[in-house]
Structure formats: structure tokens, C-alpha cells
């Protein structure tokens, strides 16, 4: 964030005592979509905040997830798994079981990552995952540059594109 950037909260999803809040950050000057990103805005950055709302009068920002190659756009939670459309970061799948505290990336809670770029895409090899929707063992990932990806969940630690 800071001067020269456009920043805002894009999404929030409540699951149990946590609310997962996705922030987006873009340069205030439009950039090319080299390496992925949003046409007209360029690369997205951002953080997924984890807010403990067990006491709604006193919410606490307790954990975060911030990959270096994407921006938290849309999230979906099913059980103890979070599915994240991470713009140029593609699809990310996180284990959100137990207590969530601190940096979820360095704790190894990312259990899967699928880069959704394709050489035949409207912007070749440039992932731009808009969301991730889980339903009946499949994750549906709409990518602005390369179309719809359907990923089968085989187990908590393996995904098959």
C-alpha cells in the first residue's frame, strides 16, 4: 500500500470464529500485464487477513497469508480448507484447521498451488485467477486469461488439475 497504490478490501468470508478478509493492492499507474495481472491495472498484490470474531465487539487480526506472486481476490471455505483465487498466483489451497496465528505461509499451511496460466490464453502464460469455488470434490477456478479450470481434490495434500 501507501502512496502510489490503489488498495482496498475486496472480499470477506466468515467460517466459525474467523473472518477471512482479502485485500487487493495495485499500482495507481496502469501497467502492462506482463507475467499476469489485471488488464489495465497490472499485477495484483495483497494479503489475506484472518480476523478472530469470537467476540464481535472486539475483533482481533490474528493471522495472515501473503504470497509474493498474487493478490487475494475471492475466497471459499469448505470445512477446514480455504480456496483462494490469487490473481497471477493462480489457485491456492490452505489448511485452516485448528488455531490460526501469525504467518500462515511460513507455517506450511499452503497445501496446494495450481498456476492457471496457459500458452493458449488471451494473455499467454499469464495466470489471472478470479476466484475458487469448491463443490462436490472439485474446485472451479475462473481465470480471466485462460478460461475455466476444474481441479479434482484427491486428498487434503494432493490436487489433480
Language-model-detected regions and their locations in the chain:
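Feature marking well-ordered beta-strand scaffolds used for ligand recognition
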Residues: 1-161
Amino acid at each position: 500500500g501507501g502512496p502510489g497504490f490503489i488498495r482496498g478490501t475486496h472480499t470477506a468470508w466468515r467460517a466459525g470464529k474467523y473472518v477471512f478478509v482479502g485485500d487487493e493492492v495495485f499500482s495507481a499507474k496502469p501497467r502492462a500485464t506482463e507475467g499476469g495481472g489485471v488488464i489495465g491495472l497490472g499485477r495484483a498484490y495483497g494479503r489475506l487477513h484472518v480476523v478472530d470474531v469470537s467476540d464481535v465487539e472486539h475483533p482481533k487480526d490474528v493471522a495472515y497469508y501473503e504470497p509474493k506472486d498474487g493478490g487475494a481476490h475471492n475466497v471459499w471455505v469448505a470445512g477446514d480448507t480455504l480456496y483462494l483465487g490469487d490473481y497471477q498466483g493462480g489457485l491456492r489451497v490452505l489448511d485452516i484447521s485448528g488455531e490460526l496465528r501469525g504467518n500462515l505461509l511460513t507455517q506450511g499451511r499452503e497445501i496446494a498451488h495450481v498456476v492457471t496460466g496457459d500458452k493458449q490464453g488471451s494473455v499467454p502464460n499469464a495466470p489471472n485467477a478470479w476466484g475458487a469455488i469448491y463443490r462436490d470434490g472439485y474446485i472451479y477456478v475462473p481465470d480471466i486469461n485462460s478460461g475455466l479450470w476444474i481441479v479434482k481434490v484427491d486428498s487434503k495434500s494432493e490436487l489433480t488439475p
